[in-house]
């Protein structure tokens, strides 16, 4: 991306503060889309009319988790299978003087404005309606690199109510507007254009999701490591980093981001390959002489120990690991890598050789400005108890198991330059 086409975050915040819209583009490996984003409490009829005419996408309002609870904005569906984990709630219309069907420009502007008004209550809205609220993850773009979180972060940083309106931008023919079309749109209407990647960098300079709590020397059967414990500001979990050698140089560092698996890591369960991957990663780091293993408390791909054991029971009935999660009302993978990225940043890691079979983890970390120069496979020998599990990870979750590890299967070019 040519940096001259983009504006600074501060310039975008000033426009939002003045009641203007900005264009925000996300990662090309995620949705590669541009959205109009503005502050909900600054909305006008003219703004809504402009969005419906020039954007043509779905007009939504991003709210915080706490605000969604206050307004009783329940999830649109019990089982969210959205490809990008978009947290839609039930749609709403404002109950206010002058609001009729909910679809007119005036009606939608009033609904958006009332969603951005912190004095509004649940009784001020009818359900369903014509505006679609989205629940932003706590921690904003530092937890999830999406337009929903960007809208809330930008509104808050601009000094407005932490509620943002957003709408995908489509071309005249109905296709998604990509960067070349968004640059033309920026010039035509004099709008600021920013990237979520730059917003992440901006937030990382000002906010932290974790802080170092304590560091200790830890001799293990794999070798000796520095064990650093981190406290999280967004939940009650403590995360760990196993560090070997100097990881702050420009030389790429061997890195493993490992999510907790008590059954596999501690009790050597044959249902998964987690324990073997953990042991292999620590062994490889010791052999390399330098590296980092981040241990995140995200048991059961984020669903927790109790639900993971419930999923095991379903798997014994014939469900695969993805189907079991979904039957329990969860997505196949609820992990987020924002905290892991912040820990790596705190440790001074700049470039990494990432030990993973999971392409989602690659994209998840790259979204936070970390440069991954190589993917190092961690394929473990299967056993009769986990063969079906490994096949499902390959076939349904896209894990690169039993495939070529050439550069055609792993794109690293885009991390070389920041927009």
From Swiss-Prot:
Gene Ontology MF annotations: 3,4-dihydroxy-2-butanone-4-phosphate synthase activity; GTP binding; GTP cyclohydrolase II activity; magnesium ion binding; manganese ion binding; zinc ion binding
Region (GTP cyclohydrolase II): 206-419
Requisite cofactors: Mg(2+); Mn(2+); Zn(2+)
Binding residues annotated for Zn(2+), in chain numbering: 261, 272, 274
Binding-site residues, Mg(2+) 1: 31
Active site: 333 (proton acceptor), 335 (nucleophile)
Functional note: Catalyzes the conversion of D-ribulose 5-phosphate to formate and 3,4-dihydroxy-2-butanone 4-phosphate. Catalyzes the conversion of GTP to 2,5-diamino-6-ribosylamino-4(3H)-pyrimidinone 5'-phosphate (DARP), formate and pyrophosphate.
Protein family: In the N-terminal section; belongs to the DHBP synthase family.
Sites where the protein binds Mg(2+) 2: 31, 147
Site-annotated residues for Essential for DHBP synthase activity: 130, 168
Organism, scientific name: Pelodictyon phaeoclathratiforme (strain DSM 5477 / BU-1)
The organism's place on the tree of life at top rank: Bacteria
Pathway per the UniProt entry: Cofactor biosynthesis; riboflavin biosynthesis; 2-hydroxy-3-oxobutyl phosphate from D-ribulose 5-phosphate: step 1/1; Cofactor biosynthesis; riboflavin biosynthesis; 5-amino-6-(D-ribitylamino)uracil from GTP: step 1/4
Cofactor mode of binding and number, as noted: Binds 2 divalent metal cations per subunit. Magnesium or manganese. Binds 1 zinc ion per subunit.
Membrane-spanning ranges: none
Pfam family, one: DHBP_synthase
Designated name of the protein: Riboflavin biosynthesis protein RibBA
HAMAP family (UniProt xref): RibA, RibB, RibBA
Region entry DHBP synthase, spans: 1-205
GO biological processes: riboflavin biosynthetic process
EC number: 4.1.99.12, 3.5.4.25
Positions with a binding annotation for D-ribulose 5-phosphate: 30-31, 35, 144-148, 168
Keywords: GTP-binding, Hydrolase, Lyase, Magnesium, Manganese, Metal-binding, Multifunctional enzyme, Nucleotide-binding, Riboflavin biosynthesis, Zinc
Annotated GTP binding sites: 256-260, 277, 299-301, 321, 356, 361
Presence of the UniProt keyword Glycosyltransferase in the record: no
């Amino acid at each position: 991306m040519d940096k001259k086409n983009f504006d600074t975050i501060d310039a975008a915040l000033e426009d939002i503060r003045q009641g203007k819209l900005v264009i925000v583009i996300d990662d090309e490996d995620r949705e590669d889309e541009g959205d109009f984003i503005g502050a909900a409490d600054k909305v006008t009829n003219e703004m809504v009319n402009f969005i419906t005419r020039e954007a043509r996408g779905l007009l939504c309002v991003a709210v915080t988790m706490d605000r969604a609870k206050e307004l009783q904005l329940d999830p649109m569906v019990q089982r969210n299978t959205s490809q990008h984990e978009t947290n839609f709630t039930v749609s709403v219309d404002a109950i206010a003087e002058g609001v009729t069907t909910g679809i007119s420009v005036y009606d939608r502007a009033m609904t958006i404005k009332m969603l951005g008004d912190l004095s509004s209550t649940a009784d001020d809205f009818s359900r369903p309606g014509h505006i679609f609220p989205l629940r932003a993850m706590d921690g904003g773009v530092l937890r999830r690199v999406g337009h929903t979180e960007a809208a809330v972060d930008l509104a808050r940083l601009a000094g407005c109510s932490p509620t943002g309106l957003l709408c995908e931008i489509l071309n005249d023919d109905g296709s998604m507007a990509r960067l070349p079309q968004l640059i033309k749109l920026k010039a035509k209407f004099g709008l600021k254009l920013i990237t979520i990647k730059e917003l992440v960098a901006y937030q990382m300079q000002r906010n932290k999701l974790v802080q170092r709590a304590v560091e200790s020397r830890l001799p293990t059967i794999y070798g000796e490591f520095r064990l650093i414990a981190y406290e999280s500001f967004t939940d009650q979990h403590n995360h760990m980093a196993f560090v070997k050698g100097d990881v702050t140089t420009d030389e790429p560092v061997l890195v493993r981001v490992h999510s907790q698996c008590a059954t596999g890591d501690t009790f050597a369960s044959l249902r998964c390959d987690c324990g073997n991957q953990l042991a292999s990663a620590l062994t490889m780091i010791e052999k390399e002489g330098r590296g980092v293993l981040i241990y995140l408390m995200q048991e059961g791909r984020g669903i927790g120990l109790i639900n993971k054991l419930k999923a095991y029971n379903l798997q014994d009935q014939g469900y695969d690991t993805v189907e079991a999660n979904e039957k329990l009302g969860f997505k196949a993978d609820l992990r987020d890598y924002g905290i892991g990225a912040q820990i790596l940043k705190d440790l001074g890691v700049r470039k990494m050789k990432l030990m993973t079979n999971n392409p989602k983890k690659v994209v998840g970390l790259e979204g936070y400005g970390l440069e991954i120069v190589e993917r190092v496979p961690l394929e473990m020998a299967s056993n009769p108890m986990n063969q079906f599990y490994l096949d499902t990870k390959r076939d349904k979750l896209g894990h690169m198991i039993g495939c070529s590890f050439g550069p055609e299967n792993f794109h690293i070019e885009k991390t070389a330059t920041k927009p």
